[in-house]
Amino acid sequence: MDKEHKMIYLCLAHMSEECMEQKYVKEAFDTNWVVPLGPNVNGFEDELKAFVSKNSDGTDLQKEVVALSAGTAAVHLGLLACGVGPGDEVCVQSFTFCASSHPITYLGATPVFIDSEADSWNMDPELLEKAIIDRKEKTGKYPKAIVPVDLYGMPYNCDRIMEIANKYGIPVVEDAAEGFGSRYKGQVLGTFGKFGVLSFNGNKMITTSGGGALICNDAESKTQVMWYATQAR
């Protein structure tokens, strides 16, 4: 007799029994805020900022958040804000969704894929450092950025990756699209690097059906990203 196989969904969106989602959709139409700006978006950014800035031990981080059209856009603008451009190289995790690497090529740069370690399935720190040294020897310059990923809510080796990044002066754009809500040593994933990427696609921990956000280290970085995202308005 064949066994019955039950589908286990990686992530399934849940609508509240109180229909709160419909309330806010109606509110947007009633107030004519149907553009991707306005009080609901501002409030969402503020709540995200409050969440990512609070460590589990009660201490605070100084973070800013920009809501964007997609997680891919967050990777794109994070790399752009790091100065990535034609002729540059960016170290990126090989085991990931293509949105982690496509923005690198959008900017005319070249991805340098780094394989994963067995424990976390995420970027192997030792292979990362070897790649950085190798690219410096072959091209005369270091990679312009590093993009580690938090797959399936699992943190990459944040301590070691950040140690290597700081050693060589390379900014980190942390792809926490699948890691929102998870913490490493009490700190929210996406808050370790210069920028952190969030996604609110339909298969993520919280969803707006589509959309994303970029966690920034300071108001200046947020202003720069907002300038890119809103056509310099």
Regions found by a protein language model. Give the residues of each.
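Conserved PLP-binding active-site segment in aminotransferase class I/II-type PLP enzymes
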Residues: 1-81, 85, 129, 148, ...
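Hydrophobic alpha-helical segments that mediate membrane insertion or helix-helix packing
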Residues: 48, 74, 90-93, 104, ...
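Structural detector of well-ordered beta-strand residues that form the stable sheet scaffold
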Residues: 66, 91, 112, 171-173, ...
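Conserved PLP-anchoring active-site segment centered on the Schiff-base-forming lysine
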Residues: 76-134
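Residue-level signal for well-ordered alpha-helical positions
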Residues: 81, 183, 225-228
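Aromatic/hydrophobic pocket-lining residues that form π-stacking "cages" and hydrophobic walls in ligand
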Residues: 100, 161, 225
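Active-site phosphate-binding strand-loop segment of PLP-dependent enzymes
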Residues: 119-208, 213-222
